[in-house]
Amino acid sequence: MLIDSHTHCRYSPDSKSDPEDNILAAIDRNIQVLAFTDHVDRVDNALDYVFDFDAYIKELNGLKERYKDKIDILIGCEMGLNPSMNRVIEPAMADDRFDFFIGSMHTLDNQDVASTIRRMTGDFLDYYLHYYEEMFNAVESTKGFHVLGHMDYVDRYLTDKSMIPKFVRYRDIVAAVLKSVIQKNIVVEYNTGGFFRGLPYGNPKDDILKLYRDLGGERICLSSDAHFPAHIGRGFSEAREHLKALGFQHLTYFKNKQPIEVPLK
């Protein structure tokens, strides 16, 4: 069964894709379950972004009905994790019209991670430690999200990938994040977008996936992070084989905020 658990359309600020075009592309690629997960990032400055939930849900429900015999459409959202804004993040994620929420670290100290890391020079270790410490705080304190998105998202945006700190230097804080994820039954996302953003791996990298398995983690979903119809489901054949080789036995997705597990065959 092919499931793409993370895609974007024109309700996100960084996509212009028509939702129906995404659906048609998914059907063409024999994807049985397609999740729309458009961006919401709540920060205390001009980066703050939220879309019209009512319009989004109305449009997607119409498409869901139109294509119900060909594909299962899930209505999700990628919520930017930011513990300082939990007062608005958590009520939004209580909306039961959504099938699920991905929690992702797009900002740190109310600043865009991608822009910040591109400007930085020197040793990035302190930034990495702070990034994962804040991720730990978010997982511990934020209620209502079901999937932890592209954990090592920060890796994508170093201009010189050789400057990514050695994993052993921040392994302990990543382990703390993963232990909390496991305890809270949050699903870890494997996002093939990393392969297409200058990395030789999906997000998260194998160091994190192997640590997750070593700690007893089993729940994982597979996502393209597509912002264009042509990118839906890309890299999935290789990704599925890779996850199986690492010992994962099933994929998890959410419908009506309830987990559904399917064999990873």
Feature roles, as predicted:
Residues M1-C9, P19, D109, K161-K265:
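Charged catalytic cores and adjacent phosphate/nucleic-acid-binding surfaces used
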Residues M1-V88, A92-D95, D99, Y157, ...:
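An N-terminally biased module of ancient metal coordination in phosphate/nucleic-acid-related enzymes
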Residues L34-T37, F98-T107, V147-M151, E189:
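Non-cysteine beta-strand/loop elements that form the S-adenosyl-L-methionine
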Residues H39, H106-N110, Y153-V154, G217:
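Short connector loops/turns at beta-strand edges and beta->alpha or beta->beta junctions
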Residues F53-E65, D72-L74, P91-R97, D123-V147, ...:
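Histidine/acidic residue-rich metal-binding segments in metalloenzymes
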Residues A114-Y127, D155-K166:
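Surface-exposed cleft-lining segments at the edges of enzyme active sites
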Residues H150-T159, N185:
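Active-site rim beta-loop-alpha module in soluble metabolic enzymes
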